[in-house]
Amino acid sequence: MRTQKHSLHRRPLPNAAVQQFKLETWHKYSLYALVAALFASGLVWLLARYFLRVTGEYGESIHPLEHWAMQAHGALIIPLSFLAGGLLFQHMRRAHRALRNRYSGWSMLATLLWLALTGYALYYFASESLRPYWSAAHWIVGLALPLLLWLHIRLGRRLSA
C-alpha cells in the first residue's frame, strides 16, 4: 500500500502533542516578570515624560527618571524577544494546529509585532516632527499589553477546563 507524501491538509496532532503547548513554569514566570518590568519601565517613562518635568533657569528639562526608564525599557526587550521567540514552536504552532485560543493568540502576536515595529521606528527613523505620533502609537498599545496577556491566559485556561 502506498502512502501519500504530500497533502493539502495537515494531520491532526496526537493527544500527547496537543497538551504540550502549555508553557514550562520557568518560561511562563520569566515572561510574566519581563512583561511586568517592561510595563513598569514604560509607565515610569510616561510619568517622567509628561508629569515630572523639571523647570530650571533655562526652561523645562527632562526628569532624570526619563532617561533611565527608557534605557531599562530597551534593555528588557532583548530577553523578552528571546523568550517570545521560544514560544514559536512549542506553544504557538501546536496551539494553532490544535485550534486552541487562536484569536487571542494572533492578537498577542500582532500586538508584540506592533510594539516591536513602533519601538524600532522610535529608535531608528522617527523624525522629531513624527516622534510624538510614533511614541503614542507605541505606548497606547503597550499599556494594553498586560490586559491582552491576561485575557489570552484566561481564555486559554477556560478552554482547557
Can you describe what each PLM-predicted range is?
Residues 1-161:
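Membrane-embedded alpha-helical bundles that constitute the cytochrome b-like, heme-associated redox core
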